[in-house]
């Protein structure tokens, strides 16, 4: 899958990121997502999102999908995730929709915060990353956006929307959720 400059900002990001299609199949993820779940990226692509959630959390994940279909986004949704070794961790899911040039929903960009890792150091790292990513997206908008094809513009717009949403998350408050 071709990676635009906008998507490259997520490659080794400190946050877990995945892109899914409109039926919940994982189309892409970053190394942080794969590593935290204990898989190779190639083992994740093409799998349904439910493979990374224990059965007792399927209803919560289903509710999250329902909210996403109805509103185009999901914010602060606590869901338990399952690693390949069977261990679990509480995560906080944030998702924004991706649309094509005709405003048809293609899928979502999803960021998951591992709530067990919400230290002051990690929060500082996230804030720095969000700031740098927003700056990079601003550069792309200014210098490259007009030359992008429709698919790349759609990807850029989806990522910009995601980072705009993430910049409103109170990361310090996440330390208290578990």
Language model features with spans:
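PAS/LOV and related PAS-like sensory modules
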Residues: 1-22, 122-149, 155-168
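PAS/PAS-like sensory domains
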Residues: 15, 67-78
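PAS-family sensory domains
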Residues: 20, 80-86, 93-96, 99, 104-115
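Conserved hydrophobic beta-strand signature of PAS-family and PAS-like sensory domains
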Residues: 26-27
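PAS/PAS-like sensory domain cap-loop motif
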Residues: 33-44, 55, 102
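PAS/Per-ARNT-Sim sensory domains
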Residues: 55-66, 77
């Amino acid at each position: 899958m071709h990676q635009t400059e906008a998507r490259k900002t997520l490659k080794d990001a400190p946050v877990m990121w995945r892109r899914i299609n409109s039926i919940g199949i994982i189309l892409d993820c970053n190394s942080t997502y794969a590593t935290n779940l204990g898989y190779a990226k190639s083992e994740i692509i093409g799998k349904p999102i439910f493979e990374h959630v224990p059965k007792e959390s399927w209803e919560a994940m289903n509710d999250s999908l329902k909210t996403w279909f109805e509103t185009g986004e999901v914010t602060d949704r606590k869901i338990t995730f399952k690693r390949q070794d069977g261990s679990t961790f509480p995560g906080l899911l944030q998702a924004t929709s991706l649309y094509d040039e005709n405003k048809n929903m293609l899928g979502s960009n999803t960021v998951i915060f591992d709530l067990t890792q919400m230290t002051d150091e990690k929060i500082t790292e996230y804030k720095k990353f969000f700031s740098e990513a927003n700056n990079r997206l601003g550069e792309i908008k200014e210098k490259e956006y007009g030359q992008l094809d429709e698919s790349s513009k759609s990807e850029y717009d989806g990522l910009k929307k995601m980072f705009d949403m993430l910049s409103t998350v109170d990361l310090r408050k996440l330390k208290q959720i578990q």
